[in-house]
């Protein structure tokens, strides 16, 4: 891998994002679409930008992302995790501020499986005493 780009893998729920940071002007490309085209919701866009705003590197990098799996929220979280890891690879001094904000830790919460005899993961059929 060349020294002109930094790489980070991010995961959240069932989504996986591969993130490449290259020196640039702040353009974010996700699956060959712009951030605005890819995410309709402003909250998802905000989540993606959080690590860049925290480290004040919004206009410093062009970001290229490939994301697969999951839904809107999971993909946004995976991209944030990937950007965080790539920023740490670029400059290790970012780690403490990113860790304090909670972006370095992989959110391990996954969907709980549905159990036999139950309607959902934990929802039980109505109990009848008589």
From Swiss-Prot:
UniProt record similarity statement: Belongs to the universal ribosomal protein uS9 family.
Keyword list, A-Z: Ribonucleoprotein, Ribosomal protein
Gene3D superfamilies reported for this sequence: 3.30.230.10
Source organism: Azotobacter vinelandii (strain DJ / ATCC BAA-1303)
The protein's name: Small ribosomal subunit protein uS9
Leader sequence residues: none
GO function term, MF aspect, one: RNA binding
GO biological process: translation
Keyword Phosphoprotein: no
Highest taxon in the source lineage: Bacteria
UniProt keyword annotation of Ribonucleoprotein present: yes
Pfam family, one: Ribosomal_S9
GO cellular component: cytosolic small ribosomal subunit
